[in-house]
Amino acid sequence: MTMRIDTDKQMNLLSDKNVAIIGGGPVGLTMAKLLQQNGIDVSVYERDNDREARIFGGTLDLHKGSGQEAMKKAGLLQTYYDLALPMGVNIADEKGNILSTKNVKPENRFDNPEINRNDLRAILLNSLENDTVIWDRKLVMLEPGKKKWTLTFENKPSETADLVILANGGMSKVRKFVTDTEVEETGTFNIQADIHQPEINCPGFFQLCNGNRLMASHQGNLLFANPNNNGALHFGISFKTPDEWKNQTQVDFQNRNSVVDFLLKEFSDWDERYKELIHTTLSFVGLATRIFPLEKPWKSKRPLPITMIGDAAHLMPPFAGQGVNSGLVDALILSDNLADGKFNSIEEAVKNYEQQMFIYGKEAQEESTQNEIEMFKPDFTFQQLLNV
C-alpha cells in the first residue's frame, strides 16, 4: 500500500512558525539566508554588539562541492568570488629556505580562494532582510514550553521560537536537549596573532611569504601564516600541549612578554625572520585544540524541535580545512529538508539531516584527526601532506 503525502501540507511545515538561530557566524547566517529564500520566518541571535565587531581569526576558504554549493544555493557564490583571493602556498623549513611552492593555476583560481571573516559576514548580512540579526544577545538559558521554546538572554528581553537551531560554535553551552556529549581536548595547542602593516613591521618574514600563504614545521612545532588578511598578516603556531600544561596553561596570554619568551624558547633554532614575527606581535590568543566527537547518537526524544549545525554540531581540529565547509553543508541539507516538502514533520526533517551529517561529519573529523596525528610527528614536513 502506498501512502500519499500531502504536499501542500509539507510545503507549509514552517509557514506559521518561527525559527531561532543561535549564532551569527557564517554557518548560522547562511542557514538564515537559505530559510528566508523559502519564505520562512527566521531570527538570528548573535552575541557580538553589532555588525562592525571584528572577528578574530584567519581567512576562510570555501571548497567546491561543499561550502561553495551552499553559497551557490544562496545566490552569493559570485559575490564570494569577487572578494575572495586565490592564494598559493610556500613550504619553508626552520632556516627560512623555501622548499617548494604551490601556485594557483588560472583554471583552479575558484577552487578554494581565501576570504576575510568579516568580508564573508558582510556578504551574508547584506543578503538578509532588515533586522533578521538581533545583536548583543548572549543566550544564557533555553527552556521548552508547551508549544514553544523560551530563549533567555543576558540583560535582554526573552524570545520564543518553534524551532531552535544552535549555530553558536564549538563551545556552545546549551546542547543538553540534543546530546550529553562533551567537548574534548585533543592534546595540541594553538597560538594565533595578527600583525598590521606587516610589510613595515616584519618585512623579513613578509618577504619570505612573497604573497603566498606560508607553512613551516620543525620538530613538532608548526607555523601557518597568511600575509594578506585584509591588510594584516595572520599567523598561527601549533604544538603538542606540554605535560605541565595539562591542568593549567603555564603561559599568561594577558602578558605579552610571557608569550614572547615562551615562543622564542620554542623557536630558538629557527631563522631570525621567524623570531622577527614573534617580536613584532603586540598580543596573542591561545587556544587548546578541541573536538566535539560524533561518537554517540544524539537524543531521539527532545521536548520540542531543536538541532545543531556547524562547530556546535561537529567541532574538529583545524588541520584539514573542513570545519566551515562541513557547517555550510549542514545549512544546505537542513534548509532543504525543512522547505522542500519531503517530510511530514519538522522532527523528521531534522532527523534526516542529522543522519546525513553524522556520516560526512565523522569523515571530516577523522581526516582532521589523522592529519593532526601526522603533523605533530618530529619528522613531519608539509610537503608530504600537500604533495608538493
Curated annotation (Swiss-Prot):
Anhydrotetracycline, a poor substrate, prevents tetracycline degradation in vitro. Changing N371T: E.coli is more resistant to MCN, increased affinity for MCN, decreased affinity for NADPH, increased growth rate in E.coli. The keyword NADP applies. Its EC number is 1.14.13.231. Binds 1 FAD per subunit, which helps bind the antibiotic substrate. Its cofactor is FAD. The keyword Nucleotide-binding applies. It is found in: Cytoplasm. Keywords: Antibiotic resistance, Cytoplasm, FAD, Flavoprotein, Monooxygenase, NADP, Nucleotide-binding, Oxidoreductase, Transposable element. One of its GO terms (molecular function) is monooxygenase activity. GO terms for biological process: response to antibiotic. Monomer. HAMAP family: TetX_monooxygenase (MF_00845). NCBIfam families: tet_monoox_X. An FAD-requiring monooxygenase active on tetracycline antibiotic derivatives, which leads to their inactivation. Hydroxylates carbon 11a of oxytetracycline and tigecycline. Acts on many tetracycline analogs (chlorotetracycline, demeclocycline, doxycycline, minocycline, oxytetracyclinee), probably by monooxygenization. Tigecycline, a new generation tetracycline antibiotic, is rendered less effective against E.coli by this monooxygenation, is much weaker at inhibiting translation in vitro and binds Mg(2+) considerably less well. Expression in E.coli BW25113 reduces its growth rate about 5%. This is Flavin-dependent monooxygenase. It comes from Bacteroides thetaiotaomicron.
